[in-house]
């Protein structure tokens, strides 16, 4: 089983993924962001974009990573990810669904104010020089995640991480 946790930066994807891993025996987390960091580090960018999701290599590697992790997991593969581009989302989700027709995609949601507050609390700079990219991305995610296109909506606004993880567990085990 593959469980994709979509949502904006700061909405709690990694925290929820860790809680799900502890609730799903044999599960592992595959975070495609790690590969994105590698691509940024080795500077494979072929455009002005600073978003590794713009790279076909990243999108195909995300699918390949899910496939490989699925071979070695003794439970679910949990994939925290921040999609707001429908084309990229469709490309990756369709390919993963071809590997695992039971793919579950959830989209964590919180207000822009809450997301900003959480990012600041964890030490992420969201205003001023050097923060333009993340400021733009959290707004893009907020706007894109207003409907269920990017996954089954899960409200995180007034809920603890444990409550959110429990809600996702309830949905995938019913």
Which residues does each PLM region occupy?
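Glycine-rich phosphate-binding loop used to anchor ATP phosphates in small-molecule kinases
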Residues: 54-103
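Conserved phosphate-donor/acceptor-positioning beta-strand/loop module used by diverse small-molecule
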Residues: 99-119
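P-loop (Walker A) phosphate-binding loop of NTP-binding proteins
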Residues: 8
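Small-molecule kinase domains that catalyze NTP-dependent phosphoryl transfer to phosphate-bearing small molecules
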Residues: 121-167
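Hydrophobic anchor at the beta1->P-loop junction of P-loop NTPases
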Residues: 5
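ATP-binding Walker
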Residues: 11
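Conserved substrate/cofactor phosphate-moiety recognition/catalytic segment
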Residues: 18-63
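Walker A/P-loop
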Residues: 14
């Amino acid at each position: 089983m593959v469980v994709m946790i979509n949502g904006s930066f700061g909405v709690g994807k990694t925290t929820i993924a860790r809680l799900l891993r502890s609730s799903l025996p044999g599960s592992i987390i595959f975070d495609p962001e790690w590969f994105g960091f590698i691509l940024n580090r080795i500077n494979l960018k072929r455009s002005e974009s600073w978003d590794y999701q713009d790279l076909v290599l990243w999108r195909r590697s995300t699918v390949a990573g899910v496939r490989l992790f699925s071979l070695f997991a003794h439970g679910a593969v949990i994939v925290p990810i921040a999609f707001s581009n429908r084309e990229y989302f469709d490309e990756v989700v369709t390919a993963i669904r071809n590997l695992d027709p039971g793919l579950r995609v959830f989209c964590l949601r919180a207000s822009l104010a809450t997301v900003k507050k959480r990012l600041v609390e964890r030490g992420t700079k969201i205003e001023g020089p050097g923060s333009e990219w993340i400021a733009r991305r959290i707004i893009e995610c907020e706007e894109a995640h207003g409907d269920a296109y990017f996954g089954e909506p899960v409200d995180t606004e007034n809920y603890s991480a444990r409550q959110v993880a429990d809600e996702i567990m309830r949905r995938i085990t019913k």
